[in-house]
């Protein structure tokens, strides 16, 4: 895998073109429906998008609507081993994280994205959901660590489907209300590990609430 350049946040003109191509395809293949788009913050708001991890197309599902800004997605490093996949994902603003290794480069890059006025997206669970019903799983600390470091709010988003997502199934993407650092308990000068874990849990609870409202 070619070494990812964490030193600068890129801008690619191909992003909007790729987004425009994929939007009608996913609407047709997955009968996709969107809810809560009014909750997507206005430009200039500092926030992170947190999404349950259902399948490889999660970034496309969530970023497709017109009022959703470019999302810089944290994705597992293994996906970047294929040169074409790496080229494509980089131009969709994905960046690699080495899972389970305390990848500080990816965390620092996530903070850079937010502090430079862009929007980062992350799947708090850290891996794809294995449950056959698609039930969201427990969050890891990463999303709360980055939110604390950048004083960013968090937009919970749930990708909802009865069972595993596949062609022909109905998918709903539900955008929740923005969670502020104060609501998450991350506005303290110093946060303990418990504070971070509680904030990550609260974010995941909100995602699960959105999911349950559509699936159950």
Where are these regions (language model features)?
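Non-catalytic C-terminal accessory region of glycerolipid acyltransferases
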Residues: 1-13, 107-216
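A transmembrane-helix-recognition feature enriched in membrane-embedded lipid enzymes
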Residues: 2-36, 83-92
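Short, basic, glycine/proline-bearing loop/turn elements
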Residues: 22, 91-98, 126-130
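Short gly/ser/thr-rich secondary-structure transition/capping motifs
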Residues: 28-35, 101-104, 157
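A secondary-structure boundary/capping signal
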Residues: 36, 52, 75-76, 93, ...
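Short amphipathic alpha-helix with an adjacent loop that forms part of the alpha/beta core around
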Residues: 38-42, 111-112
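Catalytic core of membrane glycerolipid acyltransferases/transacylases, capturing the structured
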Residues: 42-101
């Amino acid at each position: 895998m070619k070494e990812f350049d964490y030193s600068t946040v890129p801008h690619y003109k191909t992003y909007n073109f790729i987004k425009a191509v994929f939007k009608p395809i996913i609407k047709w293949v997955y009968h996709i429906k969107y809810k809560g788009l009014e909750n997507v913050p206005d430009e200039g708001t500092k926030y992170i998008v947190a999404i349950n991890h259902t399948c490889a197309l999660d970034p496309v599902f969530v970023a497709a609507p017109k009022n959703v800004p470019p999302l810089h997605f944290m994705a597992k490093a293994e996906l970047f081993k294929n040169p074409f996949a790496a080229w494509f994902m980089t131009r969709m603003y994905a960046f690699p994280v080495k899972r389970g290794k305390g990848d500080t480069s990816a965390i620092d890059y996530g903070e850079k994205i937010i502090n430079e006025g862009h929007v980062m997206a992350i799947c708090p669970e850290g891996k794809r959901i294995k449950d056959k019903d698609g039930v969201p799983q427990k969050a890891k600390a990463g999303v709360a660590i980055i939110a604390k470091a950048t004083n960013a709010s968090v937009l919970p988003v749930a990708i909802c489907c009865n069972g595993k997502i596949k062609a022909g199934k109905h998918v709903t993407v539900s955008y929740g209300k923005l969670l502020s650092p104060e609501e998450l308990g991350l506005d303290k000068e110093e946060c303990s590990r418990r504070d971070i874990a509680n904030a990550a849990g609260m974010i995941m609870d909100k995602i699960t609430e959105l999911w349950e409202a559509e699936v159950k």
